[in-house]
Amino acid sequence: MKRLAFLLFASACASSGTTVENTTPKQTPIFQSAETGTLMTDRPRATAISVAAPASNVWLAVKSVYAEMEIPVVVDNPAMHQLGNSNFAKSRVLAGHPMNEFVDCGSGMTGPKATSYRIYISLLTQVSGNADGTTTVQTTFVPMGQDVSGGSSDRIPCGSTGRFEQLFLDRIKATLGK
């Protein structure tokens, strides 16, 4: 009898019809070749802060931080408050820090690949004034690496550790505090 009760209970649980929601993040193709197939990654996400300062002051602080970090600016749209560069290269060091502090391209036999690869970076910043007088700063940092020791000219997707974005936004706040 106990066995029959257990089987009835187990079958009732199995047919309860629970639905599982798919929470897998949507990925986009970023590279495709015959050798590697299609590489997928998450879409780049902006890191944002809100500061208690007018957008015009924040805009000047952002420009100052780009110059301080020696990041060449090619997108400079004051009307839309957009600033940055969608394709610049750095090797070994970024903003005075070792590249592997900010970028993860995986590891090879000699250590982190970000320390020896040429890193191509897209860094774009948007400054938006809010109705309450604060300003939102959103910055998007997307690194890709290229092995310069071999004959390959292909760039591979790299990840961000999140530390660069934090340093960048912290320096904006520090510049505003001066």
Segments from the language model and where they lie:
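Sec-dependent bacterial lipoprotein signal peptides
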Residues: 1-13
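Ser/Thr-rich, low-complexity intrinsically disordered terminal regions
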Residues: 14-178
